[in-house]
Amino acid sequence: STTASNVSAAFSQMGKRVAQIGCDPKNDSTRLLLGHICRHTVLDLERERKGGEIGAEEIVNVGYNGIRCIEAGGPEPGVGCAGRGIIVALEKVRQLEALGDTDLVLYDVLGDVVCGGFAVPIREGYAEEIYIVSSGELMSLYAANNIAKGIRKFASRGRVKLGGIIGNSRKVAHEEELLREFAETIGTQLIAFIPRETIVHDAEIHRQTVLEYAPQSTQAEVYRRLAKAIETNEKLTIPEPMVFDELEEMVERYGN
């Protein structure tokens, strides 16, 4: 979500009309754009109104630099299915035409494709390009590989393709080289490698993106370059996921 919000902020600084939709029950995708946790998610309003009318303006919160922020929300703790909630929420967004006149919509989706609900932006054609954020840690790469499997499964139904891997550094040994080989092995590219810097944490404490908190910083420029790389990216592919044993061997090789 930190990467997603900074990319949204970078696109908005490029003059794009941007919307970001958080597809995670935690409701925290747009926190850095709004300066607070979203107080009214789509599913919150659905529960409150019990089938009554909801206005588009009620589910859209305008954040940094005019970015339209929407949180799908989730079920009450211990009740219902979060994945199903995302299906309901995105359908409501579509019905209400809540995105307005936007140039770019960013869907921030939970990392693991744990059920069909979380794959809705891929499966139902909401998204055209998928970017996977991953570190060089084994379980992060495992999740990335699972998402690649999901993209491959649903790519035949529409135009969705994988645009690349966004490296999100955890300071693992030889991390950038590992991520680059992983990306190339599954048939895509390492479109950016984001270093782990304390300024990102400092900005989060102030409930801001790096683009807002420190717009002249080197880290802000990293996110701007990523946004430009996404804007001009023409390498969109259907991935060829790895088998786990091969992935594990690759990680071990770079760790030695």
Language-model features, listed with the residues they occupy:
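N-terminal phosphate/diphosphate-binding loop that engages ATP/GTP or pyrophosphate donors
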Residues: 10-72
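Conserved catalytic-core segment of NTP-binding enzymes
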Residues: 13, 88, 95-104, 109-196, ...
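Flexible beta-alpha connector loops of hexameric P-loop NTPases
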Residues: 74-84, 138-139
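C-terminal boundary of histidine-terminating zinc-finger modules
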Residues: 206-221
